[in-house]
Design a protein with these regions (language model features):
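Domain-level recognition of nuclease-like catalytic cores that cleave nucleotide substrates
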Residues: 3, 109-149
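Arginine/glycine-rich "motif VI" loop of SF2 helicases in the C-terminal RecA-like domain
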Residues: 96-104, 135-138
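Conserved catalytic cores of phosphodiester-cleaving nucleases, focusing on short active-site segments
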Residues: 65-67, 71-80, 94
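Generic structural signal for well-ordered alpha-helices
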Residues: 91, 95, 127-130
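Active-site-adjacent loop/helix micro-motif of nuclease/hydrolase catalytic cores
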Residues: 75-91, 119-122
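Soluble or luminal CAZymes and related metallo-dependent hydrolases
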Residues: 29, 33, 86, 125
């Protein structure tokens, strides 16, 4: 069964897609996609999904969505550009979340755009790191959203 949070990301990505070379326009579009995704997931079950969950106040970092029922964090990097840096940063957010709480997160689903993200994330180093984290009971996976053809 497909993950409804990932499905919502694909839908938000497809609906709001714009082709522009303007950096400001692309930033606004990415923000609109992320907001649409968070709203759609919240509508699925507002008691289950915590939106923009604070890791710790002193770090001023948030996890996009926390599935409180399954102990799963979701992060959506709309543009695949710079996805590797965001990927590692998001893993650190989950590790710190788990250090600061009794109720731990057991998984992270990192969602990003396929064209730019896959070449860097479907690679030996990220795969080795995900394998290592699984040995520490943190399951990390990468899901890709794509332009519908």
């Amino acid at each position: 069964m497909e993950d409804p949070v990932v499905q919502a990301a694909q839908l938000a990505f497809s609906v709001r897609l714009k082709n522009s070379s303007d950096v400001s326009e692309n930033t606004k579009n990415a923000q609109a996609i992320a907001k649409s995704w968070r709203s759609a997931v919240h509508a699925l079950d507002p008691d289950r999904f915590q939106i923009e969950a604070m890791v710790t106040p002193e770090l001023d970092q948030k996890i996009d969505i926390v599935d409180q029922e399954n102990g799963c964090a979701y992060e959506f990097k709309v543009s695949g550009k710079n996805a590797p840096a965001e990927f590692y940063k998001d893993i650190v957010k989950v590790i710190i979340w788990n250090q600061k709480r009794k109720k731990k997160l057991s998984s992270l689903v990192f969602i990003t755009e396929e064209k730019w993200g896959r070449p860097f994330l479907d690679a030996p180093m990220p795969r080795a790191y995900m394998k290592y984290l699984a040995e520490l009971d943190l399951n990390v996976s990468v899901e890709y959203v794509r332009h519908e053809t």
